[in-house]
């Protein structure tokens, strides 16, 4: 595995690889890799001749009161996870390398961002789309891999890739969970012992809602109210949202049908956790 820290070298490598006909699987991350990221890397390894992993904590996607400075970082651990999962190139640029001067252009996302996490984090998805536009141009991937834990992000990325005719296939990868159902996340380290015991109730609330939908409930408000009440009963967390939308359009639905997402965000003392399920309802 080769570690690359400059845009110029990474772009030179990927241009040569693509010119020689090699397929490139790309996994963009902010580091502090866990089993969820490893799953993305293994999927990329299965489907491509070359795997490129990026580790970059992107300042553009953090708001003024968010956790940029305390976002967990451990490059030695990330290198080990990368090597264990067959990465060929680890792209590890500095902020100065990615943004040598103030951006004169950013990508503004106008749909799919005014709900869920986007409602709470104005500018977040513009930051995500801007850094991905840069990373796609640097790594020139055939396929790029994203976990469905950030399902809104996946919907936004699929939209912007289609809108700008970017020649990359976006591959959705299912959420990876702990044995008790908690979605794996770099931010889980911020949970206290007591909160860690409560956190699996996020997924349990979604499973309960799914059972009600499969039993015939079609009223979206009834389902989201059930989820909120369940989380408020079984955790000390504060429900930020529990919402149901069409997916991937993220349009509001009153009656549940077609492809939908049920998504939640819950604030604990030092961390905000998100989770979701997607399902097709006939």
From Swiss-Prot:
This is Pantothenate synthetase. The gene is panC. Beta-alanine binds at residue 61. Keywords: ATP-binding, Cytoplasm, Ligase, Nucleotide-binding, Pantothenate biosynthesis. Coiled coil: none annotated. The keyword Transmembrane does not apply. Belongs to the pantothenate synthetase family. HAMAP family: PanC. It is found in: Cytoplasm. The reaction proceeds by a bi uni uni bi ping pong mechanism. It comes from Bacillus cereus (strain ZK / E33L). Pathway: Cofactor biosynthesis; (R)-pantothenate biosynthesis; (R)-pantothenate from (R)-pantoate and beta-alanine: step 1/1. It catalyses: (R)-pantoate + beta-alanine + ATP = (R)-pantothenate + AMP + diphosphate + H(+). It comes from the Bacteria. Its EC number is 6.3.2.1.
